[in-house]
Amino acid sequence: MPADAASPRLLGGAAAGSDALVLGIETSCDETAAACVRGGTDVLSSVVSSQVDLHAKYGGVVPEIASRAHNELIIPVVARAMVEAGVDGRRIDAVAATTGPGLIGALLVGVSAAKALALTWDVPFVSVNHLEAHLYAALLEDPHLELPMVVLLVSGGHTMLVLMEDHGRYRILGQTLDDAAGEAFDKVARFLGAPSPAEVPRGGKPGRGAA
């Protein structure tokens, strides 16, 4: 995870303790998401459009289908995030977007939209490393957490134990060598004939054949 390729720490330095307003865009896999965040931790809005129903019949995410769905959803999702935050482009100080890891086609949609908005509003575009953003999620939840700390990162194709020594300084203590936890879970579920997440009953009721 190259520290200079990600923005949480950069935005932390620029926005923490200030009123800097950042529009964040995420399209790394099968969710189109946008959020407006002030001062690094104050989430004014967070809009997520899931494609889980769209991919259910395939037993997993289909990259091409995901990319096309992002193309259709990116503008309304961003617009809704800004409306819910009560802001317009004149108040945005920077636009951030996930640039990887992730599905290439899906990432391109979010990055292209973010760069276009940044250019239109004449504000900086900030590249976000997907994995580094996950590390910083804990700090978003509790800004008072102190470094160094050990983080268990489980996201899609990545499962690793990371030591956050300082902002932008990380050491991978261990990681899966082949399939990540999520991938292994999906493969076993398909082998057992388990339903896709979209078909799993909600409310604590076990699905058919649940162990």
Please describe what each predicted stretch is.
Residues 2-20, 28, 35, 154, ...:
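A short helix-loop
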Residues 4-20, 128-150:
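Conserved phosphate-binding catalytic cores of ATP/NTP-utilizing and phosphoryl-transfer enzymes
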Residues 10, 17-91, 97-101, 108, ...:
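N-terminal beta-alpha supersecondary unit
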Residues 17-20, 30-32, 41-44, 90-93, ...:
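Short coil/turn connectors at secondary-structure junctions
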Residues 24-25, 96-98, 129, 150-155, ...:
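Short beta-strand segments
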Residues 97-121, 140:
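Short Gly/Thr/Asp-enriched flexible loops that form oxyanion-binding sites at enzyme active sites
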Residues 114-134, 174-180:
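Short, acidic/small-residue loops that bind anionic groups at enzyme active sites
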